[in-house]
A protein has these predicted regions:
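Conserved phosphate/oxyanion-binding catalytic-loop motifs
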Residues: 56
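Asp-based, Mg2+/Mn2+-dependent phosphohydrolase catalytic module
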Residues: 2-20, 27-45, 62-78, 88-268
Length: 268
């Protein structure tokens, strides 16, 4: 684990692409961090690229692009990665044509429909669990019934909590999965960070080798863990969920630790 600035600077020489988490890394809730623009401008000035990757499956691609635009960050579609697209690509390869029951927001359901999936409320082949801020007892009950009856069961993102303003949190997809597990005894395979399928997706989308990629985020068990056992550089920022004292008690160790991306901008 590197904290020395000169060593971080040396490590950054090989990096061509930065994959940035969003909540807790570039903004918190509705508030953009004051150093975010400086970091992004520095990345471009040093002829590197940046992409955003969010595990938050409650919104669609357009919503995230619009949110960034509203914060003064204009990006191409290819620069915005969402955990939903990781599972959609995998499902297309392995379960094309199957019928799905999506526990998710209207935006998530529309995303599945836009990619050609048939949503089935009666007898689906697959249950998909997303971060559902519109969750109801009826949805939970149906999902549990379908899972007990033998439907395949996949989760989009394993995050337990979603960070909000004023150091508050709301239950995320991982917490919902634990609720379903308590009822059915089944826990899903997840596809967002830290899944190896997400890492494969990032490498494929960027066209870079793993040793040229750095992933930046505020969560040890998703943003940092996704790089474990790979040549991808993991950079933990302390501007979101994780505090410095959490690192000592965690099995997941980042390659680099910084207070926030504003510090990293000075080392590129």
């Amino acid at each position: 684990m590197i904290t020395d600035k000169k060593m971080i600077q040396k490590k950054m020489e090989a990096i061509r692409v930065f994959i940035l988490d969003m909540d807790g890394t570039i903004y918190l809730g509705k508030n953009l961090f004051p150093y975010t623009h400086d970091f992004l401008n520095t990345v471009k000035a040093t002829e590197r690229e940046y992409y955003f990757f969010t595990n938050n499956s409650s919104r669609d691609l357009a919503a995230y692009i619009d949110k960034l635009h509203g914060m003064g960050i204009d990006i191409d579609k290819k620069q915005m990665m969402v955990s939903t697209h990781v599972i959609l690509r995998w499902l297309k390869k392995h379960h094309d044509g199957r019928r799905v029951y999506v526990v998710g927001t209207p935006a998530l359901r529309k995303e599945f429909e836009a990619h050609g999936w048939i949503l089935d409320e009666e007898k689906p082949d697959i249950v998909i669990l997303g971060f559902d801020t519109t969750l109801t007892y009826e949805k939970l009950s149906k999902a549990c019934t379908f899972i007990r009856e033998g439907a395949l069961y996949y989760g989009i993102n394993p995050d337990l909590n979603c960070p909000m303003e004023h150091d508050t949190f709301i239950p995320d997809c991982g917490s919902m999965a634990k609720l379903i597990e308590a009822s059915t005894g089944k826990y899903p395979e997840f596809f967002g960070k830290p899944s190896g399928k997400t890492l494969d997706y990032i490498v494929e989308e960027t066209g870079c080798s793993p040793d040229q990629i750095a992933i930046i985020g505020d969560r040890l068990y998703t943003d940092i863990k996704v790089a474990d056992g790979s040549q991808v550089t993991s950079i933990l920022v302390l501007s979101g969920e994780t505090k410095a004292e959490d690192i000592d008690t965690s099995d997941v160790k980042p390659d680099i630790v910084i207070e926030h991306i504003g510090e990293l901008a000075k080392l590129l």
